[in-house]
């Protein structure tokens, strides 16, 4: 991959694609800025590194080569002068780059600005009864530079409830509505409950949670922690604030709002699900997305789209939800990096929590900003999104997000009985069981264009499915199964008795078994029966 800048016939950077992301090759030899998530158990590769240019940038890949990629660039106002990137420029700024790298490596969770002149820290422990709040008022001009908190819990369920029942509200400069309204756990960047991780502006550690967003105000700030649950909560908190380094005029108020389905999917914009919609002048700084996906399978094929200042076509449009959050290939494994993390996982079945903070790549807007992400699966039967959006907004701007009732914040994620391919799944099988859309392998070849897909299991594992017989009688049994290059050898049984012999599902290509596989004749009584699938092994040719 070669990068050409400002019309030069010679590339400013000429490297193998993989070398951009290993943290070892100059000028990107900073492992906190150039990294492979494979090294921490996930998948995907990222490079956070400024490459300035004055006139033009052209990025060229080798002929007949391709991969998934995203490039983020920003255009400065006319008249702005920047140096053209080269290896020598990177050496000149090596001290600053090393400073950032070292901070990311060892000091996340501390203010990157260090101790600020004139800063003050308020520390307290509050007992907040149900329906009550703890309140703190500050006089400006100042900026809140850190909020930290810690609670004790009875168990995981209590933890999940408390972090959604407690709400942080912050009102700036006498405004009628709070600019910050967010369940406490989501404000600290993850959900549900407490999930330990560190990013640049937010994190949760053994010592408690932190948020390091810079939150300036001109005259006053009212900070409230409201208990909308049924249990008294004891909260230990710290709040650090400091004088402004410049007049408040020209700065923006920090906004942080939690929401679910505030803007329903519209027919003309389906499947765009709103992350943030706001009017005025400001900067978009990112989101945390809590996904509830009881159906299992991949939830996030949708692309992100950012419409700035009334654009009819988005200036940012992505390639998939996991790509936006900085990882790849639907990988559910945890990772934590300064600007993006996967902080909670249930293997893409159940809860997933991901975040992407736009700090170096924040998105400025003068009139309006709309950010959305495509959501292909409907709320019923069960894929639900909850979003925490963070942005700065000049006074007088429009923030359309109001408070969300407590019954819509906690307990809405109920696990339905597991079902896949039309079969109720009994018990908790090993691996992952889901319904897979088979349209891409041939329209009409499978009933309802889908099948039950069992992955992540090993020889000896069993999958039990419920079969309902409507009338007692003698039945000739058969099954249509799918064959593929990576499928195994299975044995089917009904109510503990084997049906025919082992079935080899290997084939170099994805096909249904036609004609259906004969399974013999059985006398079956009316009611429920159990069909068992056992993995025996695999064909030597299978991959």
Put a short name on every predicted segment.
Residues 304, 408-543:
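Extracytoplasmic
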């Amino acid at each position: 991959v070669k990068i050409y800048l400002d019309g030069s016939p010679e590339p400013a950077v000429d490297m193998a694609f993989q070398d951009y992301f290993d943290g070892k090759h100059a000028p990107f030899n900073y492992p906190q800025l150039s990294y492979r998530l494979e090294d921490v158990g996930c998948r995907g590769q990222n490079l956070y590194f400024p490459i300035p240019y004055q006139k033009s940038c052209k990025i060229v890949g080798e002929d007949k080569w391709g991969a998934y990629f995203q490039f983020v660039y920003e255009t400065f106002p006319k008249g702005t002068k920047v140096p053209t990137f080269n290896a020598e420029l990177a050496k000149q700024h090596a001290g600053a780059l090393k400073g950032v790298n070292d901070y990311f490596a060892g000091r996340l969770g501390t203010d990157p600005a260090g101790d600020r002149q004139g800063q003050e820290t308020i520390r307290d422990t509050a007992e907040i009864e149900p329906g009550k709040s703890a309140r703190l008022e500050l006089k400006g001009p100042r900026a809140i530079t850190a909020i930290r908190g810690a609670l004790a819990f009875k168990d995981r369920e209590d933890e999940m409830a408390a972090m959604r029942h407690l709400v942080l509200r912050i009102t700036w400069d006498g405004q009628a509505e709070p600019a910050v309204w967010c369940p406490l756990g989501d404000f600290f960047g993850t959900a549900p409950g407490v999930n330990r991780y560190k990013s640049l502006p937010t994190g949760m550690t053994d010592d408690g949670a932190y948020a390091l967003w810079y939150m300036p105000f001109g005259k006053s700030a009212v900070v409230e922690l409201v208990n909308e649950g049924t249990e008294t909560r004891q909260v230990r908190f710290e709040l650090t604030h400091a004088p402004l380094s410049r007049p408040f005029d020209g700065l923006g108020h920090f906004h942080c709002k939690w929401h679910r389905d505030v803007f329903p999917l519209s027919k003309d914009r389906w499947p765009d699900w709103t992350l943030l919609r706001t009017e005025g002048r400001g900067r978009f700084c990112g989101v945390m997305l809590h996904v509830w996906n009881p159906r299992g399978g991949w939830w996030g094929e949708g692309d992100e789209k950012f419409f700035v200042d009334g654009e009819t076509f988005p200036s940012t449009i992505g390639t998939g939800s996991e790509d936006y959050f900085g990882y790849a290939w639907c990988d559910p494994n945890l990772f934590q990096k300064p600007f993006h993390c996967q902080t909670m996982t249930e293997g893409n079945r159940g809860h997933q929590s991901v975040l992407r903070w736009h700090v170096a790549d924040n998105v400025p807007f003068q009139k309006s900003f709309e950010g959305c992400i495509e959501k292909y699966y409907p709320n019923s039967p069960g894929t639900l999104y909850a979003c925490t959006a963070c942005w700065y907004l000049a006074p007088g701007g429009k923030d359309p997000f109001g408070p969300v009732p407590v019954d819509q914040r906690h307990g809405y994620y109920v696990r339905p009985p597991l079902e896949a391919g039309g079969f109720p799944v009994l018990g908790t099988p090993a691996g992952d069981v889901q319904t897979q859309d088979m349209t891409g392998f041939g329209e009409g070849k499978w009933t309802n264009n889908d099948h039950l897909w069992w992955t992540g299991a090993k020889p000896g594992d069993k999958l039990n499915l419920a079969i309902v017989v409507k009338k007692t009688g003698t039945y000739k049994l058969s099954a249509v199964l799918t064959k593929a290059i990576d499928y195994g050898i299975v044995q089917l049984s009904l109510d503990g008795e084997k049906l025919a012999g082992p079935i080899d599902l290997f084939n170099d290509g994805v096909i249904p078994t036609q004609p259906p596989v004969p399974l013999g004749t059985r006398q079956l009584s009316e009611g429920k029966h159990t069909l068992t699938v056992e993995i025996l092994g695999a064909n030597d040719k299978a991959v």
